[in-house]
Amino acid sequence: SNLIDGNYVFIRLTQFQKNAAKNISTHIRKMKKKIKKSDNMKGIILDLRSNPGGLLEEAVDVSSIFLKDGIVVSTEGRDPKNKEIRYVKKTGHKELEAPLVVLINGASASASEIVAGALQDTGRAIILGSQSFGKGSVQTVAKIDDE
């Protein structure tokens, strides 16, 4: 992450690995300290270009940095008992109200698309770039009995 024109925070996220949200929050705090007046942060650019995705929970946590509340993603599985699972904003991150731009491209997939979609659908961010990969799906690991 770095500053552009002294007042715009630029964050490049290459994957949604463990602690991605924590690292983004830390970088934003550091950048705000570099800006003479914290209130003068004019905007944040979140670069998700060529980000293939990663951990769903990190995608939810990253979205939660910027969202006040609401649904980040809902999933539908094969089990009729669990047709829809909603991952709602988690607490612990103070949302930022600075204007937000998210950059994506054709190699932005999975968790990147979930974050970009959540931020766009809530009106929180403007999405710029080219069409994303189009995966927009979630995989989970299921234990199979030895029998």
Q: Regions from the language model: what does each represent?
A:
Residues 1-145:
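Cleft-lining beta-strand/loop regions that shape enzyme active-site pockets
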